[in-house]
Design a protein with these regions (language model features):
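Bacterial signal peptide processing site
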Residues: 19-22
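Short, solvent-exposed loop/linker segments at the N-terminal edge
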Residues: 38-48, 162-171
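Terminal connector regions
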Residues: 102-143, 238-273
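Surface-exposed beta-loop interaction hotspot
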Residues: 121-212
Length: 287
């Protein structure tokens, strides 16, 4: 077992006689046999552009990656990762990256991420349209570009304080969503706020116990004044793992329509203090 070199990579790529690449030069080559690369995202990365590039090294040689670039039609720029990472033969490693800003002018059907790997000895592996088995690209592109469209028309955010109604096992948290128009042209329809793995609508006379979203039914344009929307919240579950294992329980999907277009989903902006207050309300109700 050895380290995969530029010359051995090139031999794999063209199946021809090879000689070592000169010191200090780079050799661009195909992905070696047994090595696969794909884009992914862990649950705790959903809040932003953080992602992983998964390298599965099924070859007989170690890979030493000293640089990684992500670019492509899905993005407006290129991101660079210049930390060295070894991927031993027969192993898989996830390399964390911060993806570039989304290219909102690119159609969803044309989204592509390209990955370039720089190896320790100067070899360069370029992968066009890297595999995206969990649909990271359309999810991030849709969310980020929806935020751009919403921000053009209004500032939509959760307020920093949470009001509590009732006490003990009857506690209900009341979250206020504030909507402040920017005065710029456009129409924003706030359709609904969806529940999370941790939080759901509080049942009442008009809300069944199995409700999975809060209907908002608000429209905002340049002539609108500021609006406030209250949503009443209770825990989705009270088992011991609900809070201990939570990573996305306060990330509410907000469904909107921009300028009469199709429904789109973004995450409701939520101050850290508000997220903490909501989790405290869960502790109070669950005991």
């Amino acid at each position: 077992m050895g380290v995969l070199s530029a010359s051995s990579l090139l031999c794999i790529a063209i199946l021809a006689g090879c000689s070592p690449a000169p010191d200090g030069t780079s050799t661009t080559t195909a992905v070696p046999t047994g090595v696969s690369v794909q884009l992914g995202q862990n649950r705790d990365q959903y809040a932003g552009r953080s992602a992983i590039v998964r390298i599965e090294n099924g070859s007989e040689d170690d890979l030493v990656i000293v640089g990684l670039e992500v670019s492509g039609s899905a993005f407006t720029a290129t991101t660079d990762r210049d930390r060295a990472s070894a991927v031993p033969a027969g192993q898989t490693k996830d390399l964390s990256v911060e993806l570039p800003p989304a290219a909102c002018g690119t159609a969803a059907s044309d989204l592509r991420a390209d990955v370039t790997l720089h190896l320790e000895d100067g070899a360069v592996i370029a992968i066009t349209a890297v595999a995206d088995p969990t649909a990271v690209l359309p999810r991030l592109h849709g969310a980020e570009c929806t935020v751009v469209g919403v921000d053009r028309i209004a500032d939509v955010t959760a307020e920093s304080s949470v009001r509590l109604e009732g006490s003990g096992p009857s506690t209900v948290a009341v979250l206020t969503i504030s909507v402040t128009p920017t005065g710029r042209r456009g129409r924003l329809d706030l359709v609904e706020l969806r529940s999370t793995v941790l939080l759901k609508p509080a049942p009442d006379a008009s809300t069944p116990t199995d409700a999975s979203a809060w209907p908002l039914d608000r429209t905002v344009d340049a002539t609108s004044g500021p609006k406030s929307i209250d949503v009443r919240i209770v825990p989705t579950r009270c088992d011991p793992h609900a809070l201990a294992e939570d990573k996305v329980g306060t990330r509410f999907p907000l469904v909107v329509r921009i300028d009469g277009g199709p429904e789109a989903v973004m995450t409701l902006p939520l101050p850290a203090a508000t997220a903490t207050a909501l989790k405290d309300a869960v502790r109070i109700r669950c005991g």
